[in-house]
């Protein structure tokens, strides 16, 4: 088992990474007599709910669960209310623990429920998708969507543990694996050129879910994110770099309707647009743009803007992005692979030109 620590003083927590961890009582920060509410969805529940419940009951916990509809389109206040109702009906108090068992959607909703219920209860992340394991389960971002924008209602709320069982990836559809690799590639692109080079060498091993490479990859991603979160927990500066591709990607998700493109797919295209824009602004070399496109393609990820979306369709969604300050668009761009920066008030004509360039790829 590998362990990465997120260092936040009294709110520090471990990220456990390994095979078969769901049935290991020692990784759960729980004790006899604790009440637990597991938040999951029916697909994940059929694989893992029973075994986790058995493990927690062996510890001596009282365990209940609530199952939410599946998909990004259900990351809503209505789903949040289902969790609150389940907690209240079962008389859960401020000493309860909420466990998020699922992908990024479940983690985001359950985390926001934990942050909100009776002004905050203990929260444990058990991410079951690659995207959630390397990104959304770490760092304390929780949220639900609004019809006008993604993740517009939320809070920073850290878990007390993240438990990553890499065997859960074996039950995922291949499309979900590929989507998760977008966030993996992002880490190399923004902060770690050596990791990017490692990914170029081992991307086929990761697609094939070879455990040795998977665990090494997940641990590296978690360490990069943990280091950034330690330095900038609430995204006042450096943490914004983790949003490479996300401003464009969120525009795609919102415009097409949540769930039509997976988050990682939209981020992949968003990273490609950001790379092309960086090149047009005189920063990123054409060779680095080509390397990024090749790696995304090897991960079976899209690099072209959706056929049904015009360049002008992006801007209204992008102006609702949480990084916008004083009405000015702020974008994460690249000087080189492994070196990202935040650009302020980039000329919209350059932005539109980059989107159009990526539209021509389709």
Swiss-Prot record:
Residues engaged in binding Zn(2+): 183, 246, 263
Family matches, as SUPFAM superfamilies: Dehydroquinate synthase-like
Catalytic reaction(s) noted: 7-phospho-2-dehydro-3-deoxy-D-arabino-heptonate = 3-dehydroquinate + phosphate
Main localisation: cytoplasm
Record text on cofactor binding: Binds 1 divalent metal cation per subunit. Can use either Co(2+) or Zn(2+).
Keyword Repeat listed: no
Protein name in UniProt: 3-dehydroquinate synthase
Family: Belongs to the sugar phosphate cyclases superfamily. Dehydroquinate synthase family.
A GO molecular function held by the record: nucleotide binding
Endpoints of the signal sequence: none
Keywords assigned: Amino-acid biosynthesis, Aromatic amino acid biosynthesis, Cobalt, Cytoplasm, Lyase, Metal-binding, NAD, Nucleotide-binding, Zinc
Cofactor annotation: Co(2+); Zn(2+); NAD(+)
Database matches in InterPro entries: Dehydroquinate_synthase, DHQ_synth_AroB, DHQ_synth_fam, DHQS/DOIS_N, DHQS_C
Statement: the UniProt record of this protein carries the keyword Protein biosynthesis: no
Source organism, top-level taxon: Bacteria
Pathway: Metabolic intermediate biosynthesis; chorismate biosynthesis; chorismate from D-erythrose 4-phosphate and phosphoenolpyruvate: step 2/7
EC category: lyase
GO BP terms in the entry: amino acid biosynthetic process; aromatic amino acid family biosynthetic process; chorismate biosynthetic process
Binding site for NAD(+): 70-75, 104-108, 128-129, 141, 150, 168-171
Localization of this protein: Cytoplasm
HAMAP family for this protein: DHQ_synthase
Enzyme Commission number(s) from the entry: 4.2.3.4
Function noted in UniProt: Catalyzes the conversion of 3-deoxy-D-arabino-heptulosonate 7-phosphate (DAHP) to dehydroquinate (DHQ).
């Amino acid at each position: 088992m590998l362990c990465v620590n997120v260092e936040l003083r009294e709110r520090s927590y471990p990220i456990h990474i390994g095979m078969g961890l769901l049935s290991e009582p020692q990784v759960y920060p729980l004790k006899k007599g604790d009440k637990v509410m597991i938040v999951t969805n029916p697909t994940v529940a059929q694989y893992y709910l029973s075994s986790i419940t058995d493990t927690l009951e062996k510890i001596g916990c009282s365990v209940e669960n609530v199952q939410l509809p599946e998909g990004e389109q259900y990351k809503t206040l209505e789903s949040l209310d289902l969790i609150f109702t389940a907690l209240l009906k079962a008389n859960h108090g401020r000493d309860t623990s909420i466990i998020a068992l699922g992908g990024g959607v479940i983690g985001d909703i359950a985390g926001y429920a934990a942050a909100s219920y009776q002004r905050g209860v203990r929260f444990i992340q058990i991410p079951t998708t690659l995207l959630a394991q390397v990104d959304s389960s770490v760092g304390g971002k929780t949220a639900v969507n609004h019809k006008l924008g993604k993740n517009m209602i939320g809070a920073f709320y850290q878990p007390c543990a993240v438990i990553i069982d890499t065997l859960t990836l074996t039950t995922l559809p291949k499309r979900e694996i590929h989507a998760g690799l977008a966030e993996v590639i992002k880490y190399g692109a923004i902060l770690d050129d050596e990791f990017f080079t490692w990914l170029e060498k081992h991307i086929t091993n990761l697609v094939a879910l070879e455990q040795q490479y998977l665990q090494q990859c997940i641990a590296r991603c978690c360490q990069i994110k943990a280091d950034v979160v330690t330095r900038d927990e609430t995204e006042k500066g450096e943490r914004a770099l983790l949003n490479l591709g996300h401003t464009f990607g969120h525009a795609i998700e919102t415009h097409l309707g949540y769930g039509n493109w997976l988050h990682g797919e939209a981020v992949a295209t968003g990273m490609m647009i950001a790379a092309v824009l960086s090149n047009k602004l005189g920063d990123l070399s054409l060779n680095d743009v080509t390397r990024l496109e090749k790696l995304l393609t090897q991960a079976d990820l899209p690099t072209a803007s959706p056929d049904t979306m015009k360049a002008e369709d992006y801007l209204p969604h992008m102006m609702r992005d949480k990084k916008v300050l004083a009405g000015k668009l702020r974008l994460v761009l690249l000087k080189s692979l492994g070196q990202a920066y935040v650009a302020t008030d980039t000329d919209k004509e350059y932005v539109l030109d980059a989107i159009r360039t990526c539209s021509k790829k389709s």
